[in-house]
């Protein structure tokens, strides 16, 4: 065992030496010096990644750090070489037929950059070694086998350096590699080195390509080239562009999995830039699970995954047209009204609808949505499909809804809130073929940004409970955010933090950020300290897709991918739609006071709808007459609904669950009910909720507590608070009601008084005596009619969750317990709003 351990250490040292040699020679090619400590890295971050079992997800990039705008960045001179007019990479990518047109020179969205390389590169070699040890040569090119054998045999740093020099000087012709591969002979070591350098370059794009993605529709963001993406750093020169390199085909995902072991450097660079530096920037290499990374890589790097056929593109066009014309119609009809329009991010609508259709195809029956005021009316009209005449009625201050018994809205169902805070619930046909019924529910929310987040999650959890959706497949939550709020509001982290907690897990949330690059009047550099507004989502290893808000197909694809991720892995995903806000914070606000340069650009900017219409006309998918006809059809429909709204009288509460039907209004009297329980039933319940299996070994003090409670229930004397509480819960459960209690340390009780959950002192197994009441009649899905759970150390988020849970069905007891009385003030927004 000691020998095996020392051998492993030796291999790791050899692998580390190989990586440092590669990096050192690459740095020499750029005439820039850097200490070994800076490159290799050390400390806790390295130790964290060394424990990672799979292929490294952090080879060419690491933490970003802020620098002064007027100061030199570390490595900026190297990045300048990448941007130089004579740079071979720039010409290579520009001349490639498979890439997009070269973008204008960008400028930093944030003053950050990634350091290049650290010791995680060793983890990459260790992963190759692990596969080699498990499978031998199966599915692996001989070149890797030879490399690992050399490392096992103690290859020296001098030998590695010599191999590098040969490769650097062009002494490794591909013909020799091909001949060796055909003959089954070992591939020359210099070919191995070149392959390794190319794989590091590929990994750099997977890690940091998003930094160079063209996601800003205004083109105002200037970005310095990340030095990790410069091929010269890896020792390649312009003469290597049309050379072929061996990359192998063994068990790789993405484009490297294609049956094409040899690639030219030009093709590789073209494919990488097209994939990672286009209108979508993918952040996923922070995810530690190899299966998840490989799944995403396969979706992202396979071009055939992203295409839309002619029919689907026409649908995207119509939905985009409806989004823009809805805002235009409201602007013309209600010139001075606040509506917090979606102009500048209209692609949200077709993208959101694409996610809903995909969800329906995957079996989703219910979608619970939470969102702020921005674009809310457009989502209500075009995604949820709330009747347009209802929306127009609310604009002109029409009559309030009336209840089933004819009571006025103010007494029963009406809301005094503004129209862009109201919710609704609509069932409609969705799916690719519009043949599946899906209920979409938008929760009402206050002006307090993000406060509705955990309320939505809680309602979703309750719906999953009552639908018996154990697999979390049919009920899903969707949360929309603003960029300033997503990075600024603490409730966002509280929501993310509870995403994988046992009694708060809802199978993942789809997060959509409407990133208009300004928070009311505040620029991003004054509202966050991170590179992206979405960086907080990395704490739960959620993938983040940054997408250009002018590219409707890219937005639709990102939404679809995020939805499929949620359904497959039951985890959160984030779509960051980088867009702009055409007007001020509201329509009567003047944005030129605070963002004059941005709004000069916005005034000249062509809308996404106009851009897409022009694109489809150019490609022959639509004619100019067809575009005009569709626009006229939509405007006519809006005008018809507007006329109908003049006589519209709402008849029901469309934002309230059907479970609440039949409840009395505040000014109605209900009959007095007997709340007492027969003493015989009390004793029976008391006996059951104090039973502990003989095979279970509770703590001796806990056993005394339960023995004392049994005596209380038998005699009816000296019943304390905790015993009375358990008896109350027990009688409700006995009648078939659902009881849920959560909060900090509620299972035991802050003062060690409750002990609703007890632990076996030998095995650690949990036992809940209250579940004795229905354990013999539990249904096939094991429904937990009684739930008690310790929460995260949060008040705001957890109370919001429990409030949302209580909204779905009034026939249940849902309790949040503040650990101490004044701790409730940390959740004051939920209490007040």
Place the predicted regions along the sequence by residue.
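C-terminal catalytic or substrate-handling cores of phosphate/nucleotide-
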Residues: 546, 554, 559-567, 572, ...
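Conserved internal helical-beta-strand scaffold that buttresses enzyme catalytic cores
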Residues: 2-29, 35-57, 61-63, 69-72, ...
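Glycine-rich loop/linker segments at domain edges
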Residues: 595-596, 600-601
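Active-site donor-binding loop signature of nucleotide-sugar glycosyltransferases
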Residues: 549
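Short gly/pro/ser/thr-enriched loop/turn and capping motifs at secondary-structure boundaries
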Residues: 518-520, 554, 582-583
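Amphipathic alpha-helical transducer elements in NTP-driven molecular machines
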Residues: 195, 552-559, 609
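Flexible glycine-/small-residue-rich
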Residues: 579
């Amino acid at each position: 065992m000691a020998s095996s351990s020392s051998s492993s250490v030796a291999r790791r040292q050899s692998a580390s030496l190989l990586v440092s040699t590669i990096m050192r020679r690459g740095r020499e090619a750029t005439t820039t010096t850097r200490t070994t400590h800076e490159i290799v890295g050390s400390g806790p971050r390295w130790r964290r990644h060394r424990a990672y079992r799979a292929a490294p997800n952090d080879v060419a990039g690491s933490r970003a750090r802020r620098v002064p705008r007027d100061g030199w960045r570390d490595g900026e001179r190297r990045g300048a070489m990448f941007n130089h007019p004579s740079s071979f990479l720039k010409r290579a990518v520009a001349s490639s037929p498979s890439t997009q047109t070269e973008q204008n020179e960008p400028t930093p969205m944030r003053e950050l950059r990634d350091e290049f390389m650290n010791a995680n590169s060793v983890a990459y070699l260790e992963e190759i070694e692990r596969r080699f040890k498990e499978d031998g040569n199966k599915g692996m090119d001989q070149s890797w086998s030879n490399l690992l054998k050399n490392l096992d045999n103690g290859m020296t740093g001098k030998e590695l350096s010599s191999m590098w020099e040969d490769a650097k000087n062009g002494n490794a012709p591909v013909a020799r590699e091909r001949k060796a591969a055909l003959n089954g002979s070992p591939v020359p070591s210099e070919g191995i080195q070149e392959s390794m350098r190319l794989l590091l370059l590929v990994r750099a794009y997977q890690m940091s390509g998003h930094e160079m993605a063209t996601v800003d529709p205004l083109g105002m963001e200037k970005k310095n080239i990340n030095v990790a993406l410069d091929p010269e750093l890896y020792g390649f020169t312009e003469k290597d562009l049309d050379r072929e390199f061996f990359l192998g085909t063994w068990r790789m995902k993405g484009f490297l999995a294609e049956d094409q072991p040899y690639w030219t450097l030009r093709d590789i660079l073209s494919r990488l830039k097209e994939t990672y530096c286009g209108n979508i920037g993918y952040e996923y290499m922070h995810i530690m699970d190899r299966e998840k990374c490989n799944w995403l890589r396969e979706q992202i790097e396979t071009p055939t995954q992203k295409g839309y056929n002619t029919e689907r593109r026409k649908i995207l066009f119509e939905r985009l047209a409806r989004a823009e014309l809805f805002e235009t119609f409201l602007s013309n009809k209600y010139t001075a009204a606040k509506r917090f329009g979606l102009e500048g991010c209209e692609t949200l609508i077709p993208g959101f609808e694409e996610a809903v259709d995909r969800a329906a195809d995957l079996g989703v029956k219910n979608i619970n949505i939470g969102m702020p005021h921005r674009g809310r009316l457009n989502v209500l009209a075009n995604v949820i499909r709330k009747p347009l005449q209802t929306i127009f009625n609310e604009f002109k201050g029409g009559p309030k809804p009336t209840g089933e018994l004819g009571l006025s809205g103010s007494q029963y169902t009406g809301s005094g809130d503004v129209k862009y805070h109201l919710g609704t619930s609509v069932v409609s046909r969705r799916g690719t073929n519009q043949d599946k019924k899906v209920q979409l529910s938008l929760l009402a929310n206050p002006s307090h940004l993000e406060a509705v987040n955990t309320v939505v999650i809680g309602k979703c959890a309750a719906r999953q409970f009552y639908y018996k959706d154990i697999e979390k497949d049919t009920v899903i939550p969707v949360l929309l955010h603003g960029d300033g709020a997503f990075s600024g509001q603490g409730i966002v982290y509280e929501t993310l933090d509870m995403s994988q907690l046992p009694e708060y897990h809802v199978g993942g949330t789809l997060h959509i950020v409407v990133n208009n690059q300004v928070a009311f009047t505040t620029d991003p550099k004054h509202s966050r300290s991170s590179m992206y507004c979405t960086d907080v989502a990395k704490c739960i290893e959620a993938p983040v897709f940054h997408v250009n808000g002018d590219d409707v197909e890219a937005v639709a694809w990102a939404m679809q991918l995020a939805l499929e991720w949620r359904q497959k892995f039951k985890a959160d995903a984030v779509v960051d739609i980088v867009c702009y806000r055409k007007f001020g914070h509201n329509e009567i606000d003047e944005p030129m006071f605070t963002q004059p340069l941005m709004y000069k650009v916005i005034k000249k900017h062509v809308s996404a709808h106009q851009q897409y219409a022009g694109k489809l006309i150019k490609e022959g998918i639509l004619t100019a007459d067809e575009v005009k006809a569709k626009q006229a059809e939509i405007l006519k429909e809006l005008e018809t609904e507007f006329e109908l709204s003049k006589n519209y009288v709402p008849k029901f509460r469309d934002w309230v669950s059907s479970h609440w039907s039949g409840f009395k209004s505040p000014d109605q009297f209900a009959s007095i009910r007997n709340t007492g329980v027969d003493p015989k039933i009390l004793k029976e319940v008391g006996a059951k909720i104090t039973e502990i299996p003989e095979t279970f070994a509770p703590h001796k003090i806990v056993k005394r507590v339960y023995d004392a409670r049994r005596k209380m229930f038998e005699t009816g004397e000296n019943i304390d608070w905790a015993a009375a509480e358990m008896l109350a819960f027990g009688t409700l459960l006995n009648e078939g009601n659902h009881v849920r209690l959560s909060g900090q340390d509620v299972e035991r009780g802050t003062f060690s008084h409750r002990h609703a959950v007890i632990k076996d002192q030998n095995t650690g197994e949990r036992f809940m005596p209250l579940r004795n009441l229905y354990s013999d009649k539990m249904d096939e899905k094991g429904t937990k009619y009684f739930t008690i759970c310790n929460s995260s150390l949060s008040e705001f988020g957890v109370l919001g969750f429990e409030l949302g849970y209580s909204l779905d069905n009034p026939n249940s007891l849902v309790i949040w317990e503040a650990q101490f009385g004044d701790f409730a003030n940390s959740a004051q927004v939920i209490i007040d709003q």
